[in-house]
């Protein structure tokens, strides 16, 4: 939710481009031509070939915008956008000619013509308006002095860019939404062209949205108006808690006018004497009294809450009781897991631990979530995590330029979407900006953008989370006249531990027999509902309908032996206000891939 390469056509280096398959539209339109006789049919066919040629050339010119990969040559990119505009304008003019407008009224297959018209219109609007706005922001930032030296980010250019990038992002998101609400094509080849275009547009929109969101929160987070102090809560998803995993240690992050500093990390053992994080009655009933593992609600278990706001409130309550925190105002919390740290090392550089092992952008997560428990004594584990966190987070904004800033911004956005990174500020104004930008993980709350929430907490004290793989499939069933949609969801958890591995692993990793015992909470979308909830495989307790801090949740415990799987299946109805596809918000795993696949072929939102 992207930047494109541009130069005069003769200077574009030969390389492979991802091109929307406009060529397939020609054959698809032949079906429509069967209903248009003689000369007019041939004319429509000829014009369709012209549309194909224009759009192929435009997409080739815009090939770099989708990956923000050519920030060193923004002038070249801008030239390509200008050339692409000529192509998309021509395609759009042809596709909205009199003959096309008549053909769009044809029975059955007229919608396919309308879809092609809509595709050309959206792409032309993007190239004419949204993309140039975005490129202007990048050009301004590229010419600015972003680094103030000594690891400090100059925040003034970011502050000045906030409004413009938000405007460009809003325009782009509106065009993508318009594209996604085009009539559902009936001809297979048109469907394929539409799907390929949707993939390209969504990729672009995701990246711009991530960048825009990060720009909105960075200045305040980095202390543009006053110094800030945050608790950096290090989670291990090998021992799952709803929001991530058991908190192994807590560091102190201070920010001041663009400079970020990492203070001492303290193990959870140093925090335990200072009590629990003030759980609500609902939280005590579900997470402590029910069991089988009774949560203590001390610092180790603060991620058991699926809402970051509750984890933050619990952290502040404990912080204020400690000798090191009682006289220091805590402005907020940052919750990070090893996947976030791994992705940061790709940007900030490798980390070498004391024994010479080099942690990179490929092996850091596996090391911190599994190998450290296999190969290192318990006494060293927290210190190794702290070293990686201190180096990776501490250098996020050092030696910054536009390319690095863009990478960090996109990373923060994508990691927040997957719950590998979350933050919360106690200042209400600051938190509203953070939450609106998508950086505060929370249970489903938007009727317009529906989500199902699935959150798991390990009930077998162990590090089995590394071996529990979760996959899901979301299939749209119907699109109602009232604006709601129905979906069928299959959510599967598999214990990938093999019996042959058990003998080589300690009880510290395996707990009781290498079982996964997953307390599973399932939330319906805001304003929607869940029905026909069933389970198969493993051993699952009957789902209890509970209330957790004002929201209905379906709760159960699933026991999964090595090699076994448990599947939850249920139907979902969204709010009538829904404008986007149903997604799944879930407890993060030890890798980037969420395991979610979506099939929306049945119908289009707001269309039959």
Question: What kind of region is each of these model predictions?
Answer:
Residues 2-7, 14-30, 36-595, 603-607:
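Non-catalytic, solvent-exposed segments at the cell envelope interface
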Residues 599:
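Acidic, glycine-rich low-complexity segments
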């Amino acid at each position: 939710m992207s930047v494109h390469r541009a130069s005069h056509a003769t200077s574009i280096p030969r390389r492979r481009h991802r091109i929307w398959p406009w060529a397939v539209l020609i054959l698809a339109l032949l079906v429509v031509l069967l209903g248009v006789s003689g000369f007019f049919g041939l004319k429509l066919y000829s014009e369709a070939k012209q549309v194909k040629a224009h759009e192929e050339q435009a997409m080739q010119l815009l090939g770099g915008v989708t990956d923000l990969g050519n920030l060193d040559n923004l002038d070249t990119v801008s030239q390509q956008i200008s050339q692409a505009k000529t192509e998309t304008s021509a395609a759009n003019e042809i596709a909205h000619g009199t003959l096309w407008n008549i053909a769009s009224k044809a029975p059955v297959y007229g919608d396919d013509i309308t879809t092609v018209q809509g595709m050309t219109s959206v792409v032309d609007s993007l190239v004419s308006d949204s993309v140039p706005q975005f490129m202007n922001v990048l050009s301004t930032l590229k010419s600015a002095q972003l680094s103030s030296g000594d690891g400090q980010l100059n925040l003034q250019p970011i502050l000045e860019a906030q409004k413009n990038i938000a405007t460009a992002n809003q325009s782009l998101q509106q065009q993508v939404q318009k594209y996604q609400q085009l009539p559902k094509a009936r001809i297979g080849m048109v469907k394929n062209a539409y799907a390929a275009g949707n993939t390209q547009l969504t990729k672009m929109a995701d990246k711009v949205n991530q960048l825009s969101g990060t720009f909105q929160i960075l200045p305040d987070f980095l202390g543009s108006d006053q110094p800030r102090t945050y608790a950096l809560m290090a989670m291990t998803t090998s021992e799952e808690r709803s929001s991530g995993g058991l908190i192994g240690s807590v560091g102190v992050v201070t920010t001041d006018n663009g400079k970020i500093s990492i203070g001492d990390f303290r193990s959870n053992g140093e925090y335990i004497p200072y009590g629990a994080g003030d759980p609500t009655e609902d939280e005590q009933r579900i997470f402590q009294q029910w069991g089988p593992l009774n949560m203590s609600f001390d610092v180790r278990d603060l991620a058991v809450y699926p809402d970051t706001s509750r984890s933050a409130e619990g952290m502040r309550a404990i912080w204020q009781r400690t000798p090191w925190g009682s006289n220091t105002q805590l402005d907020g919390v940052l919750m990070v897991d090893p996947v976030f740290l791994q992705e940061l090392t790709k940007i900030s550089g490798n980390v070498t631990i004391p024994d010479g092992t080099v942690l990179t952008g490929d092996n850091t997560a596996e090391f911190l979530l599994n190998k450290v428990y296999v190969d290192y004594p318990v006494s060293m584990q927290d210190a190794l995590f702290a070293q990686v966190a201190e180096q990776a987070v501490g250098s996020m904004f050092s030696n910054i330029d536009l390319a690095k800033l863009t990478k960090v911004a996109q990373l923060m956005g994508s990691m927040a979407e997957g719950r590998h990174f979350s933050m919360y500020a106690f200042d209400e104004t600051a938190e509203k900006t953070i939450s609106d930008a998508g950086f505060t993980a929370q249970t489903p709350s938007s009727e317009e953008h529906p989500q199902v929430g699935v959150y798991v907490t390990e009930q077998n004290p162990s590090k089995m989370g590394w071996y529990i793989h979760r996959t899901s499939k979301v299939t749209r069933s119907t699109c109602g006249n009232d604006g709601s949609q129905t979906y069928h969801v299959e959510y599967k958890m598999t214990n990938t531990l093999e019996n042959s591995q058990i003998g080589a692993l300690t009880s510290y990793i395996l707990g009781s027999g290498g079982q996964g015992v997953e307390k599973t909470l399932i939330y319906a979308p805001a304003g929607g509902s869940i029905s026909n909830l069933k389970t198969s495989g493993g051993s699952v307790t009957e789902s209890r309908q509970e209330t957790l801090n004002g929201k209905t949740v379906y709760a159960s415990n699933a026991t999964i032996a090595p090699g076994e799987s448990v599947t939850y299946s249920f139907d979902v109805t969204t709010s009538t206000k829904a404008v986007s596809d149903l997604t799944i918000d879930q407890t993060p795993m030890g890798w980037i891939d969420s395991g979610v696949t979506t099939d929306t072929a049945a119908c289009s939102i707001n269309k039959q």
